[in-house]
Regions:
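Structural signature of the two symmetry-related core transmembrane helices
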Residues: 77-91, 100, 278-293
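Helix-breaking motifs and short loop linkers at transmembrane-helix boundaries and internal kinks
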Residues: 42, 74, 95-100, 275, ...
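Interfacial helix-cap and linker-helix signal at transmembrane-aqueous boundaries
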Residues: 37-38, 69-70, 153-159, 239-240, ...
Length: 387
């Protein structure tokens, strides 16, 4: 890193930290107030499922579009435009009163989320390359901390109409994105060029990721995000089935999220010292063993420890996979993200279907088994680049 790039690099890192945190807040507020959206629009369970499907389809479209557009010169526009569009859509979702309007708004919301997701991760890869050391974990930790902040905000405003909350969060996010417009230009600066050109095992003759390695990264992302989806949708149910109160059950996902944030904050130093393959392998093994142990126990304390170990163990996986995909450029990042979100979206439903046949703790062994698979395959997927 040259001296002239230092200030630009610091500004870029702070800016991306804010973007990741803001995205975490928006998504947490939207998810936590979804029941209010359902009640206000008088949606059936099937209707809500259609709204979520529209958001998912929009996100896939946004990820693909963002992957095509996320060149360095376009990053400032994609970040500012994506953030403002996401904020406006959140406010619109708050005032929708029919299934039809919600479907349209949810699709555009998902598309804006997808574009912003690719742009912020592509910018993070670029910033990390220029930095010459791992910073992806801390950036993703800010998303986790933003999610916790959003959850706390939602809890504190439980008696506030969701329309008012959505409008307030949207106005804050849009104002912040607009105010940071000039700052985003530093992300396209030549000062953020990589400190070295990386040629990794698994690159094709054109310098991009080979298809087998790209799909391996995507498959590991899907397995990891299936586990994240399971924690979000089933951790509280698991504790409730063990006899926990509603308040204690709600703590389960908070424990998981806090452990993941802590792991990501420490993950960069561990990755710099031991390398991504070793750290991801050890973390995924901890996740598999911890969750399996928590499921085997019959006490609430065991279950909470299990979910904490699961979050801590998986914390470094997605940042490391995004970093590895970044070698192939924004389209590779988008491909891994799209594949990963298949696991996030389909996983909870799959676990629910399995739980209708066998006990829920047995069904929740699926994320533990997938974490074990991540531990086994991480060294191959995350081979260290060689000059």
């Amino acid at each position: 890193m040259n001296q002239t790039a230092g200030p630009e690099l610091a500004r870029s890192r702070r800016l991306l930290t804010g973007y990741f945190a803001g995205l975490g807040v928006v998504m947490a507020v939207w998810g936590a107030r979804m029941p209010a959206v359902q009640n206000t629009a008088e949606l059936s369970t099937a209707g809500l499922a259609l709204v979520l499907l529209a958001a998912a389809l929009g996100m896939v479209a946004g990820l693909q579009t963002g992957g095509r557009l996320a060149r360095p010169a376009c990053l400032p526009t994609l970040l500012t435009g994506g953030a403002i569009a996401l904020a406006v859509c959140l406010a619109v979702l708050g005032v929708c009163r029919s299934l039809e309007s919600l479907l349209v708004a949810a699709f555009v919301f998902g598309a804006a989320h997808g574009v912003l997701d690719v742009a912020v991760n592509a910018a993070a890869v670029r910033c990390q390359d220029a930095h010459g050391r791992p910073i992806m974990g801390r950036l993703h930790a800010s998303f986790s901390l933003g999610g916790l902040t959003g959850a706390a905000l939602t809890s504190a405003t439980a008696h506030t109409p969701h329309t008012v909350l959505f409008a307030g969060v949207a106005a804050t996010a849009a104002t912040a994105a607009g105010a940071a417009t000039r700052l985003t230009r530093c992300l396209a600066s030549p000062g953020l060029e990589p400190v070295h050109n990386r040629v990794a095992p698994g690159l094709d003759e054109r310098g991009g990721l080979s298809r087998p390695r790209l799909w391996l990264l995507g498959t590991l992302a899907a397995g990891t995000l299936l586990g994240e989806g399971a924690a979000a949708d089933w951790a509280a149910v698991h504790l409730h089935d063990l006899g926990a109160t509603a308040a204690t059950s709600a703590v389960a996902y908070g424990v998981y999220s806090a452990a993941m944030a802590a792991g990501r904050l420490a993950g960069d130093r561990l990755t710099a010292r031991f390398g991504a393959p070793a750290v991801v392998r050890a973390g995924a093994a901890l996740a598999a063993l911890g969750l399996a142990t928590g499921l085997a126990g019959s006490t609430i304390a065991f279950a909470l420890l299990g979910w904490a170990a699961f979050g801590l163990g998986l914390s470094v996986t997605i940042p490391s996979l995004i970093t590895a995909a970044g070698i192939g450029g924004p389209r590779a990042v988008a491909t891994v993200a799209v594949t990963g979100y298949v696991g996030l979206l389909a996983g909870p439903a799959l676990i629910g279907a399995v739980a209708t046949v066998i006990a829920l703790p047995h069904a929740l062994l699926l994320p533990a088994l997938l974490a074990a698979a991540v531990a086994a395959l991480a060294p191959k997927a995350l081979e260290k680049p060689t000059p």
